[in-house]
């Protein structure tokens, strides 16, 4: 798994791990809260038939560095800018899942000339109505989150993951929990997870109006993919996002929870390839 050390500004020296495959237009896959690059493993190869696909571990997650710093959306967007700069990518299309959607939107709003197309999968976008589950709200409480993460991290993670799927898939849940377990359960990883929960909540609550207003200015092509049975980010959230932008296409997925790219990978891959490069991938 390649590693890139970022240069310049607030991200100077930050190490990001990533997966890269394929040749063609650049596409960056941005995972959600608690995710990592390999959570896109059902999607990378089909997309790589027509594009150069980069799946990145965001700061604080996967095998990337986990600094003791802020984990606001602007910080993640700065890391994404540094990632593109380090790879020499003047422009790329972004595919963001869940929190990765909020990161991708933030980057598109602050660096519009560098984003060619934007696909949001089960994404949460600041400014549109969203209420985290009681479990996420509880873990975000200082002290309580630290206690829970110290004594029941794997169990808590599994319980949250089960809620993410329309029909819980034990193999997928076990993969999320077990893959690079040491990297994602070390104290620095738990601290980064909790900091992200708390810092992004500030963005969601204090900058909602700014995001709603800014979203109406986005001119780039946008694809929204959302599971009808998503219990993490309700499908109505996707409808709100679509109403704010003028160039959005929407794909609603039946019998699907918060992970369309896993639960209905074949359909989602077809939509993404067609949207990102303009023609379906070969069978």
Predicted regions span which residues?
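Conserved alpha/beta-hydrolase catalytic His-Asp/Glu region
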Residues: 16, 151-214
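Catalytic active-site module of serine/aspartate enzymes centered on a nucleophile-bearing elbow/loop
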Residues: 247-283
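Short beta-strand/loop motif that positions the catalytic acidic residue
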Residues: 218, 224-226
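Flexible "cap/lid" loop of the alpha/beta hydrolase fold
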Residues: 109, 117-150
């Amino acid at each position: 798994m390649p590693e890139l050390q970022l240069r310049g500004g607030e991200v100077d020296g930050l190490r990001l791990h990533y997966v890269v495959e394929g040749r063609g237009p650049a596409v960056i896959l941005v995972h959600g809260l608690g995710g990592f690059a390999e959570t896109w493993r059902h999607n990378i190869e089909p997309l790589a038939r027509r594009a150069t696909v980069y799946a990145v571990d965001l700061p604080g997650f996967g095998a990337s560095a986990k600094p003791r710093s802020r984990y606001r959306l602007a910080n993640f967007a700065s890391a994404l800018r540094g990632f593109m700069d380090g790879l020499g990518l003047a422009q790329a299309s972004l595919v963001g899942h869940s929190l990765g959607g909020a990161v991708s939107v933030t980057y598109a709003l602050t660096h519009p000339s560098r984003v060619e197309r934007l696909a949001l999968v089960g994404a949460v976008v600041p400014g549109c109505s969203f209420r985290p589950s009681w479990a996420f709200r509880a873990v975000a409480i200082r002290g309580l989150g630290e206690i829970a993460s110290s004594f029941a991290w794997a169990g808590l993670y599994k319980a949250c993951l089960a809620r993410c799927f329309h029909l819980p898939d034990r193999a997928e849940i076990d993969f999320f929990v077990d893959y690079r377990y040491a990297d994602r359960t070390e104290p620095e990883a738990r601290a980064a997870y909790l900091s992200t929960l708390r810092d992004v909540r500030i963005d969601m609550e204090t900058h909602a109006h700014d995001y709603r207003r800014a979203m109406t200015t986005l001119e780039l092509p946008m694809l929204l993919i959302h599971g009808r049975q998503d219990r993490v980010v309700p499908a109505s959230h996707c409808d709100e996002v679509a109403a704010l932008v003028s160039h959005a296409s929407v794909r609603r997925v039946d019998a699907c929870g918060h992970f369309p790219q896993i639960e209905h990978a074949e359909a989602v891959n077809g939509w993404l390839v067609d949207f990102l490069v303009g023609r379906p991938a070969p069978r």
